[in-house]
Amino acid sequence: MNWSELKNSIPNDGFAQKYEVYRRARPTVTLVILRTVTDPILFRSSDPERAETQEFNGIIHAQVNGEKFVSKERLTGLNLCRELDENENIISKEYTYNEPINSLPKSQTADMLTYGLAGTVSGATFSQKSRVIEGYTYGLEPYDLMNKEAHNALYESGTMRDESGGQSESFFHPVKVQPGTHFVHFVTLEAGTKEMLLYVIHNILGTGRYGARETRTGRDMKNEIVGLITYSADSSLRCGEL
């Protein structure tokens, strides 16, 4: 299937006719995503050793800010842009995630137009609001705060004592979200185009590492798109409504 056939296979409902900075119409497409934990994940909060929590019917569940997912997925998208780029037609070599550059034209990438950006040019600030709306999500299974791991920092001796015999105090006890935990997450594209939806879907399905220390632990989550809702107005949902 080529690019045109792929776009034509998507229903027209829920999309803007074209990209516009001013959103005179706000149709939406909401993706229903099932995120399944496949390896223990640490989602840090104000407590660096555990996730936020929410209690439903007397049972504690892990609560995760949607930005913790989307921030990783944006990196997947930027990698795609760089793979497809020739002569900086898609993305400037200076563009990096979360580090605005002093040039509005060089900041205009698929990442910026879809997920938004704020920066400064010649002393004046500019911002592009995100077309992607992501809310909190909660683990469907209980979150056991007593299931703690024990980690320490070893010296080159392979023990917790340095050359002088001093004892290291680098102990920490993370409470990770365990394999088999499921998150139902709603991600909404507002006043977006079909190209933006395909970009967002690629980023979701192409990302499998989330949470703290993911560069050392590998893939820890599987994402599946299990539903899609389109509407001429706001179709966004919140997991707390389930």
Enumerate the language-model features and the residues they cover:
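RNA-binding basic/glycine-rich loop and surface signature characteristic of RAMP-family CRISPR effectors
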Residues: 1-242
